[in-house]
């Protein structure tokens, strides 16, 4: 037998330097979470795997604040959660209303169109949320099957209020789908109390777990819609009836669906255990306090926040306006090269306009915020010696 020679690049050891991940995600994981991934790989029907999956479901119901039986994980990053919700709840010709003021709602538009949905949109500026009145008028006008909202937009640092939206949706026989990828465990979230029908979040964001697994939950009302589809879900991999069966959500004998990443489930279990040990209230309070320290520190540098109204700022992701004449990329590169500090640029509506800093995972402490402020300031000084640090007036 003859084969091509092995690649020379694989003869070298794998060396990944430590980085302080203070962008909008993924975030740094704790040693406890990383160690969990070193457990032995388990097969699809090992009892220890099913026990851990049950514990993960318990933890997810806690952080979502729900009693939903159909609470589970899909394999893939947070985009997988968006795909799973839209592909299961929408059929060809179904009308969906998407509130667009950031890149994630734009992605939802594209995905919904690919499934043949009748997509209607309302659009708003990326630094201001939609009012309850605006959403109510749009629902009354379009009479959609589903409304899609982004709770916390990591492309801008905007927080969308949700209280009251679910009630309005249900008055018009509409399901509420929520993207809580960047917000969950950083601000209050009550799935059942707020009458949310479908939600997904990102393991690699505030939760502090690795990417590649996405927690989701669907209400009994949404589950009934899926069970009564005219056609099967177009994507076998995201079929929540099949996947939910494997996760033990439906009081049925479990059937193999696909090979899950057992070691990511172990890691997520430990991340959820850490949240449970500290308590949701304390987790959220800590991140809000860290965000306030960040705001004050940036204000002393003369920097402005992309979302002007403090009531609408997402504590877990802050957009920092790039001053005129400043090369944002030089600042980011200097911070990484000299401090191993991630200073990430904007995305979507903030690309070229703002940096984005995340208060997520292990980077949600006063010490980490102080280090970020120091590294960011030194990077700005080194790359732009003429920049004048004058305290901003519009910061508090």
Curated annotation (Swiss-Prot):
Pathway connected to this protein: Amino-acid degradation; L-kynurenine degradation; kynurenate from L-kynurenine: step 1/2
Keyword Transferase attributed: yes
Top enzyme class: transferase
Co-factor(s): pyridoxal 5'-phosphate
UniProt entry keywords in alphabetical sequence: Aminotransferase, Peroxisome, Pyridoxal phosphate, Transferase
Membrane-spanning ranges: none
Organism, as annotated: Anopheles gambiae
Residues binding pyridoxal 5'-phosphate: 77-79, 154, 204, 256, 259
Family, similarity comment: Belongs to the class-V pyridoxal-phosphate-dependent aminotransferase family.
GO biological process terms, semicolon-separated: glycine biosynthetic process, by transamination of glyoxylate; glyoxylate catabolic process; L-kynurenine catabolic process
Listed EC numbers: 2.6.1.63, 2.6.1.44
MF GO annotations: alanine-glyoxylate transaminase activity; kynurenine-glyoxylate transaminase activity; L-serine-pyruvate transaminase activity; pyridoxal phosphate binding
Catalyzed reactions: L-kynurenine + glyoxylate = kynurenate + glycine + H2O; 3-hydroxy-L-kynurenine + glyoxylate = xanthurenate + glycine + H2O; 3-hydroxy-L-kynurenine + pyruvate = xanthurenate + L-alanine + H2O; glyoxylate + L-alanine = glycine + pyruvate
Reported tissue expression: Expressed in gut and ovaries.
Name this protein carries in UniProt: 3-hydroxykynurenine transaminase
Subunit description: Homodimer.
């Amino acid at each position: 037998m003859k084969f091509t020679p092995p690649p020379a690049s694989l003869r070298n050891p794998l060396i990944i330097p430590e980085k302080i991940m203070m962008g909008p995600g993924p975030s740094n994981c704790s040693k406890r979470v990383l160690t969990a991934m070193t457990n032995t790989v388990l097969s699809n029907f090992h009892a220890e795997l099913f026990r851990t999956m049950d514990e993960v479901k318990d933890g997810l119901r806690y952080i979502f604040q729900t009693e939903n039986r159909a609470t589970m994980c899909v394999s893939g990053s947070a985009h997988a959660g968006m795909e799973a919700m839209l592909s299961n709840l929408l059929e060809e010709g179904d009308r969906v209303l998407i509130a667009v003021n950031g890149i994630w709602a734009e992605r939802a538009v594209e995905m919904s169109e690919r499934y043949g949905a009748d997509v209607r949109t309302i659009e708003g500026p990326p630094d201001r949320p939609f009012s309850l009145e605006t959403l109510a008028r749009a629902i009354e006008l379009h009479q959609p099957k589903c409304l899609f909202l982004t709770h916390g937009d990591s492309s801008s640092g905007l927080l969308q209020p949700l209280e009251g939206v679910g009630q309005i949706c249900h008055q018009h026989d509409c399901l509420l789908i929520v993207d809580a990828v960047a917000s969950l465990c950083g601000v209050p979230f009550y799935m059942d109390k707020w009458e949310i029908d479908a939600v997904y979040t990102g393991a690699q964001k505030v939760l502090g777990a690795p990417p590649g697994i996405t927690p989701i939950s669907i209400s009994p009302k949404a589950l009934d819609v899926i069970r009564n589809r005219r056609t099967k879900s177009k994507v076998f991999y995201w079929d929540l009836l099949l996947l939910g069966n494997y996760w033990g959500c439906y009081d049925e004998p479990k059937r193999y669906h696909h090979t899950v990443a057992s070691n990511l489930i172990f890691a997520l279990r430990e991340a959820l255990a850490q949240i449970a040990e500290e308590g949701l209230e304390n987790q959220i309070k800590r991140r809000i306090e860290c965000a306030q320290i960040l705001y004050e520190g940036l204000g002393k540098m003369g920097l402005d926040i992309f979302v002007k109204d403090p009531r609408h700022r997402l504590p877990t992701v802050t957009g920092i306006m790039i001053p005129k004449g400043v090369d944002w990329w030089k600042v980011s590169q200097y911070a990484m090269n000299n401090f191993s500090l991630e200073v990430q640029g904007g995305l979507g509506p903030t690309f070229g306009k703002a940096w984005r800093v995340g208060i997520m995972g292990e980077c949600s402490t006063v010490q980490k915020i102080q280090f970020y402020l120091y590294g960011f300031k030194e990077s700005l000084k080194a790359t732009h010696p003429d920049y004048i640090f004058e305290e901003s007036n519009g910061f508090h």
